[in-house]
């Protein structure tokens, strides 16, 4: 290993890519195809390579007509409206529209580089017009990209933790890497930072969120601790985004602290009544279609006492959503279910009785906004409001599940990172480490992959062009 380390350190690479997920691989592939000599440094072991991309399912894509597995049309303006709705306008509109437009050419590019897509999934994640789902999920996408990168001659090193970005003025001269129990400096003519956010650093989360963050679960990789982001911010790089903003969904409270992935997400919320630990409802469970609302529920649960809540359904709804990896808690009565979940039984019974009394007759359509709403209830439920009255009853404990954070590095449309006195000469960024440039708050299903793919490709091309 010492010989390999020495060889890495003695080589001045054309492009060094820091990170090993979707954005990093897109950058490495584009740079290598442009003729650059590329080194990719992945901090995780090979078995855990890929950051949060290991857990992804789909890619949101603009298209003017049917394309590959996508149906119908999803044009720039509709895509942009969807983004504005979830971000409440907290976005760089120029970069957002640029990303949306660029997404159209990404899907065929992905297919050319080995990514395969599947027909759209059924149930609440049916997004055949807007999102293309990966056949085999995120790991299959990563395997395809790693194979492509290797075939192109990219040098890939695992368990290579970048601890510093060494600057001379506005230029990066090298990165400091901890590997094989020692630190080495590796020089590069251009650097792409694609190492993710800081969501796995609980202390950093707690500085932003307060003590409540200690109860959060990190459904993404445990390797995204924000070291590269921190050294860049400490060096004066311009930041973008709010440290309290993140992609945070409601996941099963029984999930592990780290790396539970997308299979821990609870998708029954639109068909449920959600109670806090006191047995009280606190938000409209049927506000909108689930793909447009699932990403707000982590923050909603985070605001509840002890950062926990409980989704309760009855037997009418058990087959309407994609199940979590954990089976629901099951009981024949609401009181029994409440006791099993740890909710005051009397309060839970009262809340659900009030909800049931507020439900009105009408046509129920689980895959579209059906207007089946409660009357005289606060908070209301404005769609899919059916009485919870048919045993057996089922419950899931909910916790905030953080996927990635939005505080990041400010970039321009060429993915170049902004320093204290203007753009750095040879530093680009892609993926979660710069996603706050576009995602000021909220989330749109599949859009993180869009940002990573678009800006990864741009960063790789620009870095290679700088060298050439």
Language model regions located:
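Conserved N-terminal/central alpha/beta ligand/cofactor-binding core
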Residues: 37, 43-155, 159, 272-281, ...
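A glycine-rich dinucleotide-binding beta-alpha-beta segment and adjacent secondary-structure elements
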Residues: 347-441
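Core beta-strand elements of the Rossmann-like FAD/NAD(P) dinucleotide-binding domain
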Residues: 10-13, 180-190, 423
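A conserved short coil-to-beta-strand element within the FAD-binding core of flavoproteins
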Residues: 158-171
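Beta1/beta-strand and adjacent pyrophosphate-binding region of the FAD-binding site
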Residues: 8-23, 39
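Extreme N-terminal leader/targeting segments of oxidoreductases
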Residues: 1-15, 33, 438, 442, ...
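Glycine-rich loop(s) and the adjacent beta-strand/alpha-helix scaffold that form part
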Residues: 182, 186-252, 449, 458, ...
């Amino acid at each position: 290993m010492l010989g390999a380390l020495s060889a890495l350190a003695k080589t001045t690479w054309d492009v060094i890519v820091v990170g090993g997920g979707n954005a990093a691989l897109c950058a490495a592939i584009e740079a290598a195809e442009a003729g650059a000599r590329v080194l990719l440094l992945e901090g995780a072991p090979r078995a855990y390579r890929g950051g949060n991309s290991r857990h992804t399912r789909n890619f949101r894509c603009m298209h003017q007509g049917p394309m590959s597995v996508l149906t119908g049309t999803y044009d720039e303006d509709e895509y942009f409206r969807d983004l504005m709705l979830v971000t409440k306008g907290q976005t760089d509109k120029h970069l957002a529209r640029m990303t949306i437009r660029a997404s159209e050419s990404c899907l065929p590019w992905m297919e050319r580089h080995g990514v395969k897509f599947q027909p759209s999934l059924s149930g609440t994640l049916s997004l055949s017009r807007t999102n293309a789902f990966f056949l085999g999920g995120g790991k299959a996408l990563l395997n395809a990209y790693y194979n492509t990168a290797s075939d192109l001659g990219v040098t890939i090193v695992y368990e290579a933790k970048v601890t510093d970005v060494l600057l001379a003025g506005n230029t990066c001269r090298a990165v400091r890497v901890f590997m094989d129990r020692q630190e080495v400096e590796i020089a590069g003519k251009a650097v792409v930072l694609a190492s993710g956010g800081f969501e796995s650093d609980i202390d950093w989360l707690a500085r932003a969120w307060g003590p409540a963050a200690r109860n959060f679960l990190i459904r993404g990789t445990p390797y995204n601790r924000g070291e590269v982001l921190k050294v860049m911010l400490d060096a004066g790089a311009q930041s973008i985004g709010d440290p309290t903003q993140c992609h945070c969904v409601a996941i099963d409270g029984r999930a592990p602290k780290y790396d539970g992935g997308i299979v821990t997400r609870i998708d029954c919320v639109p068909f449920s009544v959600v109670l806090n630990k006191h047995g009280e409802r606190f938000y409209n469970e049927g506000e909108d279609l689930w793909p447009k609302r699932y990403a707000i529920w982590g923050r909603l649960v985070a605001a509840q006492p002890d950062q926990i809540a409980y989704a309760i359904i009855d037997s009418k709804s058990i087959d309407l959503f994609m199940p979590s990896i954990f089976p629901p808690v099951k009981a024949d009565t609401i009181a029994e279910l409440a006791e099993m979940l740890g909710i005051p039984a009397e309060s839970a019974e009262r809340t659900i009785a009030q909800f049931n009394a507020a439900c009105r007759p009408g046509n129920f359509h689980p895959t579209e906004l059906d207007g089946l709403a409660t009357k005289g209830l606060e908070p209301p439920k404005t769609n899919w409001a059916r009485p919870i009255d048919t045993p057996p009853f089922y419950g899931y404990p909910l916790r905030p599940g953080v996927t990635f954070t939005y505080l990041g590095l400010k970039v321009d449309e060429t993915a170049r990172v902004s320093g204290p006195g203007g753009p750095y000469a040879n530093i680009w960024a892609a993926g979660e480490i710069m996603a706050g440039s576009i995602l000021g708050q909220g989330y749109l299903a599949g859009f993180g992959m869009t940002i990573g793919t678009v800006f990864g490709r741009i960063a790789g091309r620009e870095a290679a062009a700088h060298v050439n």
